[in-house]
């Protein structure tokens, strides 16, 4: 079995003691970490087939992106002035409902490339409609780890006909997807049931998905308390807000992740804490869309598990988890008038070990420890904006680093990116195909691309 040694870097372990090891090394066998320690000790003990020189670099556990939509990546930059519901109804949903299998593959592959180049080694992604298989194939080919599922809805007052499903048929199809994809790619992919939202799904559909999740012991991924109008519509229909409604249908729990959680009530926060239901915090997209700012520092104080997320490039416009850390810290501190609302250390935890906890994966990823999966990133510290380092490394990683500073990425023990060169997908080919496909998609689906300023061909 191949052994890999990453040596000579500063290892930010994110273990329980939060050890940072200068001139550290990580030994890997197969897809697991064998040992972590000082380079001289690890190199003496382990003679590995492949050695990676991490001199001048930080070695971190890969980022865990707790909420993403890969198949929306080709929507980047559209609908900038729309509120969420307008963007959904006029752009995102028509786009998702009209994609061909090839377009879904390329869009998801493009997102995977961006995630990996930004240091994300695991994502929790919700892929739409009948093309979910193609998105899962792209995830497999990219080499990223993923909690992945098919986004489904059935209420005609919530989503267009192209995205509406028959509940009974949808449950059968999801069971097929579970059998095909849960544990696929040598265990890198785990399936989750993904009701799009409480508002957009009938009780019949939600109950059926809850039964599937219990039967196969898999996770749940949805949006909750994201937008005021759907929340009020759900209250009128059921008498319950999102989290309470999900809880009444047994869709909460340690393996349940709810994106956004902007309007979570005190009672819902208590439910999330007691059931260990997690919140996926994507700070930039809701603020950018004028949707609101989740009270994440309060949720954390309430004992709710929270992980960091980028959401979709189709709304956020990028998948840079470094930026999400910075925005999260800035807006939580700014809105609470408290510079300690989210500490710098906590922000790095949200992107790594806390993200793993939010997805119930902290027994295998999220920190660099012996026995865990070998998911690591190398960040080049030899940059003006990261100098001087000293003992300010954690501060620099959160407030100064960019996605472009990620030099190499290891996922499941495999070197997926080396010195910014992706070793799985053909990056230039995917970028070319994405550009060619994008214009045709918009024309076919009647989605208007309005430039901000006069555009002269």
Regions found by a protein language model. Give the residues of each.
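Active-site microenvironment of metallo-dependent hydrolases
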Residues: 1-24, 28-34, 38-39, 44-45, ...
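Divalent metal-coordination and catalytic microenvironments
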Residues: 9, 26, 31, 56, ...
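Active-site gating loops and adjacent loop-to-helix segments of metal-dependent hydrolytic enzymes
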Residues: 74-106, 150-168, 228-255, 275-278, ...
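Alpha-helical scaffold segments that flank or form the walls of functional sites
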Residues: 76-144, 170-186, 435-443
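Metal-coordinating catalytic core of metallo-dependent amide/deamination hydrolases
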Residues: 134-269
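His/Asp/Glu-enriched, well-ordered alpha-helical/loop segment
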Residues: 248-255, 297-387, 400-401
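Long hydrophobic segments that form regular secondary structure
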Residues: 268-277, 282-288, 296
């Amino acid at each position: 079995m191949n052994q890999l040694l990453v040596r000579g870097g500063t290892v930010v372990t994110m273990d329980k003691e939060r050890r940072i090891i200068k001139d550290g090394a990580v030994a890997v066998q197969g897809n697991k970490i064998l040992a972590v320690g000082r380079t001289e000790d690890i190199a003496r003990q382990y003679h590995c087939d492949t050695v990676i020189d991490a001199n001048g670099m930080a070695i971190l556990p890969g980022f865990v992106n707790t909420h993403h939509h890969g198949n929306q990546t080709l929507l980047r930059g559209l609908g900038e002035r729309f509120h969420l519901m307008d963007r959904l109804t006029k752009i995102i949903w028509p786009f998702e409902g009209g994609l061909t299998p090839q377009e879904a593959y390329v869009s998801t592959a493009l997102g995977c490339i961006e995630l990996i180049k930004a240091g994300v080694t695991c994502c929790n992604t919700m892929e739409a409609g009948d093309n979910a298989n193609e998105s899962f194939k792209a995830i497999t080919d990219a080499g990223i780890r993923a909690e992945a599922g098919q986004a489904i809805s059935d209420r005609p007052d919530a989503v267009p006909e192209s995205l509406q499903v028959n509940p009974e048929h949808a449950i059968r199809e999801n069971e097929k997807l579970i059998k095909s994809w849960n544990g696929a790619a040598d265990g890198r992919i785990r399936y989750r049931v993904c009701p799009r939202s409480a508002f957009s799904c009938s009780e019949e559909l939600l109950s059926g998905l809850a039964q599937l999740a219990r039967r196969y012991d898999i996770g749940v991924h949805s949006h909750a308390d994201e937008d005021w109008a759907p929340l009020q519509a759900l209250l009128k229909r059921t008498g319950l807000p999102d989290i309470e409604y999900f809880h009444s249908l047994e869709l909460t729990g340690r393996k349940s992740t709810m994106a956004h959680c902007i309007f979570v009530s005190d009672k819902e926060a208590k439910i999330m804490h007691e059931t260990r239901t997690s919140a996926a915090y994507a700070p930039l997209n809701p603020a950018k869309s004028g949707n609101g700012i989740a009270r994440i520092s309060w949720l954390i104080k309430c004992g709710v598990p929270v992980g960091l997320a980028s959401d979709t490039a189709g709304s956020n416009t990028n998948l840079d988890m470094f930026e999400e850390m910075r925005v999260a810290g800035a807006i939580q501190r700014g809105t609470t008038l408290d510079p300690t609302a989210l500490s710098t250390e906590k922000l790095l935890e949200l992107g790594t070990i806390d993200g793993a906890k939010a997805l119930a994966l902290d027994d295998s990823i999220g920190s660099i420890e012996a026995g865990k999966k070998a998911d690591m990133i190398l960040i080049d510290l030899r940059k003006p904006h990261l100098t001087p380092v000293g003992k300010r490394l954690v501060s620099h990683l959160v407030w100064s680093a960019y996605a472009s500073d990620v030099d190499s990425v290891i996922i499941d023990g495999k070197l997926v990116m080396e010195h910014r060169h992706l070793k799985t997908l053909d990056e230039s080919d995917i970028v070319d195909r994405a550009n060619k496909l994008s214009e045709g998609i918009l024309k076919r689906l009647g989605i208007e691309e309005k430039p901000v300023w006069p555009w002269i061909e």
